[in-house]
Amino acid sequence: MAEPTLASGWYPRLVVGLGNPGKNYGRTRHNVGFMVANLLAVRLGSKFEVHKRSGADVVNGRLAGCSMLVAKPRNYMNESGQQVGLLAKLYSVTPADIIIVHDDLDLDFGRIRLKLGGGEGGHNGLRSVAAALGTKDFQRVRIGIGRPTGRKDPASFVLENFTTAERMQVPTICKRAADATELLVGLGLEPAQNHVHAW
């Protein structure tokens, strides 16, 4: 594909869904960011293609009145920041205009929260993005997956598929997360939080 270009005067936003590439990870809790990115691509009316200079899967278009580039890194979670950093540099997107969509162990299953900056909560993808951008001050769409019960290792838990009961709710959760992302793009952080955090 031709490299996506942003027309003069457009306000660039970079939305990144975090996950691991490959069919083996497609239905895991850690890949809910990819699931939301896929839904955003549908709303943009286009399909992901490989962006040659960054290596990420990308699609671009307009949502909520703003131009945006939606990306899914094609390397593994703990190295996903490399491709995010490249895209930000290539399209001159500041960290404040980057939105990372990711799973969150510290939120109950299905809860959606928006924030700017903060810690990584043990999330290797967020850690990689922060290292690549040189700052933690990027926006996040946090999607709750809950914590494992008993002594199960959280690192193993996030790489497991959603349970059958959870899977029935995942499409609705992803739709709400995509809606939250559009609100964040269109309204800005605080107004979007006022809407989303009341859900």
From Swiss-Prot:
Q: Which UniProt keywords apply?
A: Cytoplasm, Hydrolase, RNA-binding, tRNA-binding
One annotated Gene Ontology cellular component of this protein: cytoplasm
Q: Which reaction does it catalyse?
A: an N-acyl-L-alpha-aminoacyl-tRNA + H2O = an N-acyl-L-amino acid + a tRNA + H(+)
Q: Where is this site: Stabilizes the basic form of H active site to accept a proton?
A: 103
The cross-references to Gene3D superfamilies, in alphabetical order and at most eight, read: Peptidyl-tRNA hydrolase
Look up keyword Signal and say if it applies: no
Site annotated as Discriminates between blocked and unblocked aminoacyl-tRNA: where?
Answer: 20
Q: Name one GO biological process term.
A: protein quality control for misfolded or incompletely synthesized proteins
| Pfam families given in the database record | Pept_tRNA_hydro
Supply the PROSITE patterns for this chain. PEPT_TRNA_HYDROL_1, PEPT_TRNA_HYDROL_2
Tell me the SUPFAM superfamilies matching this sequence: Peptidyl-tRNA hydrolase-like
Record keyword Glycosyltransferase present: no
For this protein, the Enzyme Commission number is: 3.1.1.29
Which of the seven top EC classes does this enzyme belong to?
hydrolase
Where does this one sit in the cell?
A: Cytoplasm
Known partners and oligomeric status: Monomer.
Among HAMAP family, the record links this protein to: Pept_tRNA_hydro_bact (MF_00083)
Member of which family? Belongs to the PTH family.
Protein name per Swiss-Prot or TrEMBL: Peptidyl-tRNA hydrolase
What is the scientific name of the source organism?
Answer: Mycobacterium leprae (strain TN)
Which lineage is the organism of this entry classified under, starting from the top rank?
Bacteria, Bacillati, Actinomycetota, Actinomycetes, Mycobacteriales
